[in-house]
C-alpha cells in the first residue's frame, strides 16, 4: 500500500500523569488523536497537500486506524523542567513541489524559541533544495526575509506545545502534522 497524502492537519497536546506512558496517552487525548495507531514518518510536506482544520481532520479518523504523522515529542519527570515539542513547516510557492516539516523537541526553550527554531529548520531545508542562496550564520528573521523575497518559499509556520514538569508527575508534550489520504 502506498499513497501520497492529500490533506494534513496540525494538532498539539500536553499530558501529566504519575506514569510515563499514561502522560503520553493524555497528551494524545489533549491533541484529540488518541484513537489512532500512529506511525511516525519523516518530514516531507506532500505536493498539493491541503491544510485542513483539526475539526475537519478528525472527521477522517476512525478508531484503530493506521495514521501517519510527523510528531515532535518530549517528556520530563523533573519539577519545573521546561520542555517543548514543535513541528515547523515550510511551503514552496509552487504547490506542485514538496515542502518540509521539521521536528524539534528541546529542554529549556520557551514555545516561541522552540517554534522559531523548528520553523527555521524547515525553511532552511526547503531553501537548500530550491537553490536559494543565504548565509546560515544570519539570524532567523533575516533569513526568513531572504527566503520569502526569493519568491520560491511562500509560507512558513510552526505548531508548538510547551510545559513545565511537576513534582511526582511525568509531563509529556506533543506537536503533530497528521497526514491523511
Curated annotation (Swiss-Prot):
Names of required cofactors: pyruvate
Modified residues (Pyruvic acid (Ser)): 43
GO molecular function, one term: arginine decarboxylase activity
Catalytic activity annotation: L-arginine + H(+) = agmatine + CO2
UniProt site (Cleavage (non-hydrolytic)): 42-43
Gene3D superfamilies: 3.30.60.30, Pyruvoyl-Dependent Histidine Decarboxylase, subunit B
EC numbers: 4.1.1.19
Homology family: Belongs to the PdaD family.
The name this protein goes by in its record: Probable pyruvoyl-dependent arginine decarboxylase
Amino acid at each position: 500500500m502506498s499513497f501520497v497524502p492529500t490533506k494534513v492537519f496540525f494538532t498539539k497536546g500536553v499530558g501529566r500523569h504519575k506514569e510515563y506512558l499514561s502522560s503520553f496517552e493524555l497528551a494524545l487525548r489533549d491533541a484529540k488523536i488518541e484513537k489512532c495507531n500512529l506511525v511516525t514518518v519523516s518530514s516531507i510536506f506532500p505536493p498539493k497537500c491541503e491544510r485542513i482544520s483539526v475539526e475537519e481532520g478528525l472527521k477522517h479518523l476512525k478508531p484503530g486506524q493506521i495514521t501517519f504523522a510527523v510528531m515532535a515529542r518530549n517528556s520530563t519527570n523533573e519539577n519545573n523542567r521546561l520542555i517543548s515539542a514543535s513541528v515547523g513547516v515550510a511551503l514552496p510557492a509552487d504547490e506542485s513541489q514538496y515542502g518540509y516539516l521539521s521536528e524539534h523537541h528541546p529542554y529549556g526553550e520557551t514555545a516561541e524559541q522552540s517554534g522559531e527554531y523548528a520553523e527555521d529548520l524547515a525553511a532552511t531545508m526547503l531553501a537548500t533544495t530550491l537553490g536559494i542562496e543565504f548565509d546560515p550564520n544570519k539570524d532567523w528573521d533575516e533569513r526568513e526575509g531572504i527566503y520569502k523575497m526569493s519568491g520560491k518559499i511562500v509560507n512558513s509556520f510552526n505548531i508548538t506545545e510547551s510545559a513545565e514538569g511537576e513534582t511526582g508527575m511525568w509531563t509529556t508534550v506533543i506537536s503533530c502534522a497528521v497526514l491523511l489520504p
